[in-house]
Amino acid sequence: MNKKRSPKTVLAAGPSSKRGDLIELAVTALDEDGNGIGTHDGTNVHVIGALPDERVRARLTHVGKRHLHAEAVEVLTPSRARLAQPSCKRAGSCDGCPLIVMHYPDQLNWKRTFTERQIRRYQTLGAAEVLATLPSPNQLHYRNSAKLVVSGTFRRPVIGIYRRNSHQVMDIGTCPLHHPLINRVVTAVKEGIAKCKVQVYNPRTGSGLLRYLVVRISERTGTAMAVFVTVERNYNEIHHLAKHLQQSVPQVEVVVQNVNSSEGNVILGQRDYFLTRQHALTEELGGIRFTISPRSFFQVNSGGARIIYETVRQWSSLTGKESVVDLYCGIGGIALFLAGTAREVHGIEVVEAAVNDAESNARLNRIHNCSFEAGDAAELIEELVEEGERLDLVVLNPPRKGCDAGVLNKVAAAGPARIVYVSCAPATLARDLDILAGLGYATLRVQPVDMFPQTPHVENIALLVKKLPRNDRLESPAKERSRPRASHKAKGGAV
């Protein structure tokens, strides 16, 4: 992006703006995707590559009735938050980390501001304290896994991600967010594709073999797993590629061929073939060991995950006498972290494979007071209550869409003294906290955690306590929750 102003540029004006036009505007905020927000002729414009307190020249990429979208081509007046030299030479062209051009303290401030803006939309949450964002232990090289597209030809292979608004694959080379071992694996695989003449899959023609590369690493052991996703078995080509990879990077201890012949953008298929004797990695967080298989879910930022788990344990205030339910428990991370200070922990998860991993992790750590069950969260928590189980603490860790109202009603009906809610989406977190307020639970504080530096994503932990009982407290249906306050047209908040 050029920072010099060109006096010869003709700028668009008036309501007849069209795609490709150049406009000048002042940027006042960031949206939830990390794009700048400004106005042009009274219409909101979302500008890729722009920061608050900047004036930019931008090219319109989409013209809608209510919003315009643009890409900054020139920063006329830079923000104090803008870095003079970003950590990645692809900044501005890669969608992976739009905030890499911003000073890290400003990223943390924006994430708190964005979280607080979502929380304050609800009158019931006015007393909740939104704390300063906890930083990631590592701002770069924190990702312990990568899912990458393989493109090009065996003579000139490309491994990376799709360019913005395109099916063209951008070679990521050495990514500053990836653990250095991941970057070494990617480099070795590119060399191996050429050396072993591995045919690269072409989605237009349906020809070729290798579609994706998935890399996972264990920070504890310094070892790696490589998963080659192919359209068919073809053992010969992948066997030679695996041999080259392990010779080039001896830290690769697990190599898997996954066969995915389906169309579409789903990465992993249903069939795995292990090309090594070892089938999994082992990671450790806070003294708890986890088995990482090709399909296991594991947080991509190990240091950030440790902060979340430790905060949940601290806010739970367990004494060893409590019964805990961990809803949406995944592979059992939080449940196993809490087991040492609880009487018993029940993990509930809808994905059966994740429950199998959780049970395996409990055995690995010789933890005997954790049980895990696969099924519907609302139904299983109701069964626990009907069986006479007293629930002292409920931990919620749902996907981005948040919790169903039925789940929240069942949780409130169980009457735990405390609820700790872990969320990856501030908007749905605020919505669910408002529902729980109507069901008798007050949100005391919300803790943003930066799990994904250089990106707009933010995790949050909320602590809720049961209010003093009122006759009508738990009779309020979820649908009667307070309506959010009128929100600004532009999403997000200023840095």
From Swiss-Prot:
InterPro entries: MeTrfase_TrmA_AS, MeTrfase_TrmA_CS, NA-bd_OB-fold, SAM-dependent_MTases_sf, TRAM_dom, U5_MeTrfase_fam. PROSITE patterns: SAM_MT_RNA_M5U, TRAM, TRMA_1, TRMA_2. The keyword Iron-sulfur applies. Gene3D superfamilies: 2.40.50.1070, Nucleic acid-binding proteins (2.40.50.140), Vaccinia Virus protein VP39 (3.40.50.150). Residues 472-495 are annotated as: Disordered. Transmembrane segments: none annotated. Signal peptide: none annotated. Residues 484-495 have a biased composition (Basic residues). CDD domains: AdoMet_MTases (cd02440). S-adenosyl-L-methionine binds at Q299, Y328, E349, N397. GO terms for biological process: rRNA base methylation. It is an enzyme of class 2 (transferase). Residues 16-74 form the TRAM domain. Keywords: 4Fe-4S, Iron, Iron-sulfur, Metal-binding, Methyltransferase, S-adenosyl-L-methionine, Transferase. The keyword RNA-binding does not apply. [4Fe-4S] cluster binds at C88, C94, C97, C175. Its EC number is 2.1.1.-. SUPFAM superfamilies: Nucleic acid-binding proteins, S-adenosyl-L-methionine-dependent methyltransferases. Residues 472-483 have a biased composition (Basic and acidic residues). GO terms for molecular function: 4 iron, 4 sulfur cluster binding; metal ion binding; rRNA (uridine-C5-)-methyltransferase activity. The active site is at C424. Belongs to the class I-like SAM-binding methyltransferase superfamily. RNA M5U methyltransferase family. This is Uncharacterized RNA methyltransferase GSU1452.
